[in-house]
Amino acid sequence: MAVGNGLILYHILGLASCIALVYFSLGEVDLRDALPSLPFSGGASRAAAASLPFVERRGKRLFLDGRPFYINGWNSYWLMDLAVEPNTRPRVSSMFRTAVSMGLTVCRTWAFNDGSYNALQLSPGHFDERVFKALDRVVAEASEHGVRLILSLANNLDAYGGKRQYVRWAWEEGVGLTASNDSFFFDPAIRDYFKVYLKTLLMRKNHLTGLEYRDDPTILAWELMNEPRCTSDPSGDTLQRWMEEMSAYVKSIDKKHLLTVGTEGFYGPTSSQEKLNINPGEWFPNNYGADFIRNSKIQDIDFASVHVYPDNWLQHASLDEKLKFMTRWITAHVEDGDGELEKPVLVTEFGLSHQVEGFEDAHRDVLYRAVYDIVHGSARRGGAAGGALVWQLAAEGMEEYHDGFSIVPSERPSMMRLIKEQSCRLAAVRYGEEGARKVLKTVCA
């Protein structure tokens, strides 16, 4: 479809969506005041978006429009994948509408798909324009719904290609140093592959908005990699060098957006024994090559990231033991942000799987509330906890994407209430109680 025709179609669809929204829900949440940087009219306006403020870091806090900005967000890694085909695109729209109805403001999602089904990058430096337009649509639609995006740029895991696909490409072209997946981090040819991808993505001109990604404030931050690990070098030096090189490269192209590494938060060789003791369980080796404090101190990294999965990491623990661990884990990392790092800390993934023996929906309510309480308490003190993003939310009819952690909000009323409550609490820190009720309307009524 030609760009011009695509723009016309998108304007029509945007207008139709707005009319339907008004017709069916007069009390719909209005995030225009909560996120004044994002337009709500049908169709994304280049002129309007280009003049909008970016989320920025000041010391250990995030700011937007001169006020501290705290994130109640979610993960939906699949947005680009479902935006490719016309018959699945409505699920993307549905997810954004549902999120906004709960006051959620930030979504973390994949901006990569390497060499697999619906691949964005077909081979090094060669991209599928059809899939790139799907990512354009995700960014434009996020803007229309008043949602910011954290876009992850690669995967340590094999899903959606991952670092293994880059290694396979180098091996097939006869330039790879080794077949080890960890060569992604030290092989010069593979590092060059990744830089080509980074430059192409950052300078991509959205066919719907006319903005290059590096100029679009809808994007809150870039994430170098989802859960980077380099087990072949437990010293952490290989992974550290890669993070330093790639973060500097991103910033050489895009100085407007925030940047994070994407780490899970494991303490490494440069950490004290006290910190190492916080790592989850004796079975969890300190040889992943990750080093939370060292990695997060990198000059070009704006905020630190933490993940927490107590049922995966403490498989035989009771609910109380998982709760104690999770509380200690998040609190320790927020304290790092307050102290040694002097940077914001975001819990970019947290979850509890329904596939664990003895699981009850109420267990999620208990553990997720604990995460939200830590973030809210830190926000009230002006601390380093910048927010938390649940893993993961899904739209109805997406069983094929369920991974044990997926939550369809309409099927979990108590979870919807909990998420809404957190949205209101963080809005109250930013705007005051009365301001929060005005900004989020029916969510905080």
Swiss-Prot record:
Gene3D superfamilies: Glycosidases
Keyword Cell division: no
One Pfam match: Cellulase
Swiss-Prot/TrEMBL catalytic activity: Random hydrolysis of (1->4)-beta-D-mannosidic linkages in mannans, galactomannans and glucomannans
Matching InterPro entries: Glyco_hydro_5, Glyco_hydro_5_CS, Glycoside_hydrolase_SF, MAN-like
Keyword Secreted: yes
GO process annotations (BP): polysaccharide catabolic process
Tissue: Expressed in stems and seeds, and at lower levels in roots and leaves.
Top enzyme class: hydrolase
PANTHER family with a match to the protein in the record: MANNAN ENDO-1,4-BETA-MANNOSIDASE 2, PTHR31451
Name this protein carries in UniProt: Mannan endo-1,4-beta-mannosidase 2
Source organism of this protein record: Oryza sativa subsp. japonica
Lineage: Eukaryota, Viridiplantae, Streptophyta, Embryophyta, Tracheophyta
